[in-house]
């Protein structure tokens, strides 16, 4: 599984994202330009330049027509993927931590941080997708969800399958389900901070099941990742690691989840790499056991994304590199003991 190593950012990666077909990979970092790459060979298609500082988040719509970025420069920018033009900029009252298109691409969710006297918000903008008038976007949000009084700010968020719900992760370890049309808080659950004694329990990433978005995985500084059902809002599985986790993803085809993390940069020692803190960790989704690790980064993993067809994954690190991995045959053939027994029994019955 020899990866393609992409060197296009001067600073730490903050998010990597595939488009729906998986032929393009989008990346943002703590520098001020986003990059778009061909995922098959690592060739850079182009850059999106216009932000004045760190870009925290990027997303691409289902048609690969538009791309959105949000950053520390208090801006959310909308770009055309085809030619890299910025067609619209929304101003945010505080740094933008996450942007996410709804499954139909008609809405854009934006998390504004709870700093500088601003109360943390999740805003939803209606996106005009008419190619003749892309520069004509609604300036104000159609919905704003504010952090409750004395509540915990949202750090990450995403959409359920049909865009009915917005699921958010908070810095106190809770996950919340909101009505995407009214903004009403429907359910709240403490997903992190209950599996061990860790004090820092902030939710660092949220990614949904690739097949139907009916469940999602969250990673946290509490050294765990948690699988939660969207409808029942109950915890399904817990994956425990030995370092703070910055990112987690669910793989299609195989029942695996991938976790990435490592010590905070300021706490890193020379032994951290040899201890395997900076490896991508693969867990069995059902049995919750770690089944393997992939080395490569020289610092914590900040973001992972799985190719939509399940043939590989990409990781972005504190070291400024993106590594694009293609799974080999041993990955596709791997069976857990229980699965092997089940398969053998089924073969015996035929």
Curated annotation (Swiss-Prot):
Record has Repeat as a keyword: yes
Annotated Gene3D superfamilies: YVTN repeat-like/Quinoprotein amine dehydrogenase
Localization: Cytoplasm
Coiled-coil region list: none
A Pfam family annotated for this UniProt entry: EIF3I
Family per similarity comment: Belongs to the eIF-3 subunit I family.
Protein name: Eukaryotic translation initiation factor 3 subunit I
Gene name linked to the record: TIF34
């Amino acid at each position: 599984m020899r990866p393609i190593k992409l060197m296009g950012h001067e600073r730490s990666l903050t998010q990597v994202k595939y488009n729906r077909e998986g032929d393009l990979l989008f990346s943002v970092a703590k520098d001020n330009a986003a990059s778009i790459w061909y995922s098959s060979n690592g060739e850079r298609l182009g850059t999106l330049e216009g932000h004045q500082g760190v870009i925290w988040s990027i997303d691409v719509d289902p048609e690969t027509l538009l791309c959105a970025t949000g950053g520390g420069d208090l801006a959310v920018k909308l770009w055309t993927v085809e030619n890299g033009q910025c067609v619209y900029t929304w101003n945010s009252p505080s740094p933008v931590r996450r942007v996410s298109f709804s499954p139909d691409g008609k809405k854009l969710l934006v998390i504004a941080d709870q700093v500088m006297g601003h109360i943390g918000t999740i805003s939803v903008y209606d996106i005009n997708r008419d190619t003749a008038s892309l520069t004509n976007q609604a300036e104000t949000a159609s919905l704003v969800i504010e952090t409750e009084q004395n509540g915990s700010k949202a750090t990450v968020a995403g959409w359920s399958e049909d865009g009915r719900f917005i699921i958010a992760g908070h810095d106190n370890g809770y996950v919340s389900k909101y009505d995407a049309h009214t903004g009403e808080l429907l359910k709240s659950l403490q997903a992190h901070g209950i599996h061990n004694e860790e004090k820092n329990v902030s939710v660092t990433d949220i990614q949904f099941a690739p097949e139907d978005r009916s469940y999602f995985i969250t990673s946290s500084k509490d050294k765990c990742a948690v699988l939660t059902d969207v409808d029942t809002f109950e915890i399904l599985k817990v994956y425990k690691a030995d370092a703070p986790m910055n990112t987690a993803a669910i793989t299609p085809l195989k029942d695996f989840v991938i976790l990435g993390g490592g010590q905070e940069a300021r706490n890193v020692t020379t032994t951290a790499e040899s201890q395997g803190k900076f490896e991508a960790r693969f867990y069995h989704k059902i049995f919750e056991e770690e089944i393997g690790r992939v080395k490569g980064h020289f610092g914590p993993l900040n973001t992972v994304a799985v190719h939509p067809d399940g043939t590989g994954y990409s990781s972005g690190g504190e070291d400024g590199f993106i590594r694009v991995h293609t799974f080999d045959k041993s990955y596709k053939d791997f069976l857990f003991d229980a699965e092997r027994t089940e398969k053998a029994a089924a073969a015996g019955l035929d």
